[in-house]
């Protein structure tokens, strides 16, 4: 019973909020346009207008028809969207419907088997046995159907409301467009067509500039070869002693020359003999004192002259230092060492000069015997 009540309520709601069908929309638009057209033709102002009205009809009648057709298309679109939404929702309930069909079929099969029995006892016994099972299954089916009906009612109602709103909006837009066009048509019939403004001459299109030739793509530069990794510098070796420079190319080895005989070492120079010490000069012999002459007054003896100092011995010249031997150059054959120059012989010391002999004292002059001696 509950199922039937829900179904009746759904039908009532749908009848109240059902959207207009495409045919209904088309008929409503036609009636609206016809009504406006008759109103326009019956207008006193339009009837007093001039005869130049054909151009106005030629201009605005196609526009009015196009506006009505656009409104019909918009309404058809709304109806199609609503139908698609309803089909989508019904597809969702198909799975539940199939499961309920299986349960309903089991009830029908059980009760149908009872109807086919001819024996009265068997007939009532079958109904008694299947009644309890049928009631349980029917209760489950009823509950499931009630839930689905409530859900579908809400969903389908919302779909119908959206469709009606979309259709009404499309119809109102079509009415607004047709009203505006009828108003313009009325003004055109009363005042005539406005003089068309001279269309501005289209400016000559500028000649397209020749497209610049595409520059040839630069050839891809060859990728620079990776620089070789610098070899690790060898550790500095200790400087070897200077050796003869190696020849750039190995020449054939010459036959071994006989090794030069070692030069005899120079004999050591004889040391110079020590100079003999000068002999001491002999002291001069004392001169004999002259005999004193009888004089009244003896003259004092002259003092002996001082002996001349002996000249200092000249210092021996220093021996010249022997020149250092030149280092042998790195050559295949060493040069012989130069012989040291012989040291110069020391000059002999000059012999001491003999001391001058003392001059003899002058003899005393003899006094004249007379006082007058010329």
Curated annotation (Swiss-Prot):
Compositional bias per record (Acidic residues), positions renumbered to this chain: 194-363
Region annotated 86 X 2 AA tandem repeats of P-E, chain positions: 194-365
An example Gene Ontology CC term for this record: extracellular region
Compartment(s) where it occurs, according to its Swiss-Prot or TrEMBL record: Secreted
Region annotated Disordered, chain positions: 192-374
Source species, domain of life: Eukaryota
Listed name of the protein: Protein TsetseEP
